[in-house]
Amino acid sequence: MKLFDLSGKKAIVTGASRETGLCYAQAQALHEAGAEVVLLGGSEKNLEHMRQVTGGPESGYHVVSGDLTDKSSREEGFARALECLGGRVDILLNGAGTQFRCPAAEFPAEKWAHVLDINLSAMFYMCQLAGRVMLEQGSGKIINIASMNSFLGGHIVAAYAASKGGVVQLTRALSNEWMPCGIQVNAIAPGFMETELSHDMMISQTGKEITARIPARRWGKPEDLKGVTVFLASAASDYLSGAVIPVDGGYLGK
């Protein structure tokens, strides 16, 4: 369907350095819809693996290193990504994130700073870098990854909840500025998702209790994010901006 066709579009995706992760599934969705995709950031070991998995530039993927929390590394990585895409970026998907669990009274200052740096500050700076290009183009799509903890406080995840709440407000603030310029800024809030990192929790007693509360009666899978990702990256969402879309199996409706 032409409305969802991304042929010729140029995309940068952060947080997709793991083959089994959510953001790689989203990067795949963009690629399958026709976009040329840069995977930006992550450890060099993971990125080298992703180069092998994706097949490299010949197959429409580029893999670029860069520490998103370091200004010079982030800017150099973005510049390389932009060069790979011929100087244009139509889609930015901000998926890089981290988590740290600790009671608030004992939360280490350096861990608080680290979580906020990756989940919120780096996201803003990536939006800023891509936004400058998109403003010159007069068009663009930015997709930020929020969380259930954008709406729910969670338990012993103060920094994560604060950062993901910030993602929602950042998305709205940028939408207010940039929608009049032809740039749509939206967010996806994944629910409880089945990944390599969450598997042990999913099969625990707590995980079973969570499953019982999800109307879909299962945890989400990375591929459950593919459809909404293509929608938000395509012309189908041209009149949608500042929105936060939960993909949670109905969890928030309970």
Question: What do the PLM-derived regions correspond to, one by one?
Answer:
Residues 5-38:
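Canonical Rossmann dinucleotide-binding motif of NAD(H)/NADP(H)-dependent dehydrogenases/reductases
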Residues 105, 152-158, 180, 217, ...:
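Active-site loop immediately N-terminal to the catalytic Tyr-X3-Lys motif
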Residues 127, 163, 171:
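Active-site helix of classical SDR
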Residues 147:
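Residue(s) in the substrate-gating loop at a strand-loop-helix junction
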